[in-house]
Amino acid sequence: DELEIMPEDEGMSLHTDFNEEVVIDGNLSLIGSIFRNLTENAIAYSEGKNIFISLVKNNETECCIRFEDDGVGVEEKQLSRLFERFYRVDKGRSRQKGGTGLGLSIVKHAVLFHGGSITASNRPDGGLRFDFSLRKH
């Protein structure tokens, strides 16, 4: 239940590609917050219609997951600041959409808590891409 996300209610489609089972010994609430906050961010700011979540790597020690949307992306110079607390790319649009500016910071700290790392980049064909890893044990 914690991981159930409904972007369809906001007019977006969720596409997943997990070709094998992933088991992580971690805090379910924090792992849920990673997916929830990334999804809420995509719904609020991407202006796209699709969210893609895929398993990139799954081995004995870690799994790597890619979370993407097909929106407009952000300027390259802002990518490094996306995980800062209270940072907003477009301050005017953020006020209209609500939120605290903490979502992506929460994502980063939840990933770090699980011994992983996270990066943000623009997709070549538009939108944002988040690649993150989670240690299994």
Language-model features and meaning:
Residues 8, 13-23, 60:
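Conserved catalytic submotifs in the C-terminal HATPase_c
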Residues 69:
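Acidic ATP/Mg2+-coordinating residue in the GHKL
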Residues 74-88:
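Short conserved segment of the HATPase_c
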Residues 42-43:
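Short helix-loop "hinge" at the ATP-lid/N-box region of the Bergerat-fold HATPase_c
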Residues 49, 115-116:
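Conserved glycine-rich
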Residues 31-32:
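A residue-level detector for a conserved hydrophobic packing site
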Residues 50-61:
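Short beta-strand/loop element within the Bergerat-fold HATPase_c
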